[in-house]
Structures are given as C-alpha cells and as structure tokens.
Amino acid sequence: MKIRPLHDRVVVRRMEEERTTAGGIVIPDSATEKPTRGEIIAVGPGKVLENGDVRALAVKVGDVVLFGKYSGTEVKISGQELVVMREDDIMGVIEK
C-alpha cells in the first residue's frame, strides 16, 4: 500500500537516533525519546492559497528534516511507522 499526501502535507519516516553516547555508554530503548528527524518519503502538491493558487512545497522527497516530537499524526502503512504532517510542522532541512 502507498500513501499520497494531500495539499501541504508530507509523509516522513523517522530516522533512528544514536543509541550510544560519545563516551561509549549504550542508551536503553526505555530511556530514548522518539526521533525528531526523518526522511521525507512523499509530498503533497502544495498549499492552496486564498486566491486558489497552489504554492509548491519547499521540501522534496529524500530531504532529511527536523520536526517537533509532537508534530503530525503517526500512521502504520505496510508495516512501516510513518508520520504525516503539514509542511509548517517542519523546523528545517538537515543538509549533508
């Protein structure tokens, strides 16, 4: 199954955070928070403006983004846990 987001929504796959500290200490699953960065796997066509025009999104498939831990709605599709959120929920794109 595939998801196609509408309007200014994007679908993000969370990226795993580092589970060891700089000193080599392993952090258990129970002590880690949900990752707040992920890779965009699908984008909607854009935001519909008041005059009816559609403004394209500033992000694209493959971008690694930073978002708030309470952003979007979690969904499970084809065994993958994904987050559907508005472009406004994205704080920034992490550049390589």
From Swiss-Prot:
It is found in: Cytoplasm. It comes from Legionella micdadei. The keyword Nucleus does not apply. GO terms for cellular component: cytoplasm. It comes from the Bacteria. This is Co-chaperonin GroES. Pfam families: Cpn10 (PF00166). Heptamer of 7 subunits arranged in a ring. Interacts with the chaperonin GroEL. One of its GO terms (biological process) is chaperone cofactor-dependent protein refolding. InterPro entries: Chaperonin_GroES, Chaperonin_GroES_sf, Chaprnonin_Cpn10_CS, GroES-like_sf. The keyword Lyase does not apply. Gene3D superfamilies: GroES chaperonin. SUPFAM superfamilies: GroES-like (SSF50129). Belongs to the GroES chaperonin family. The gene is groES.
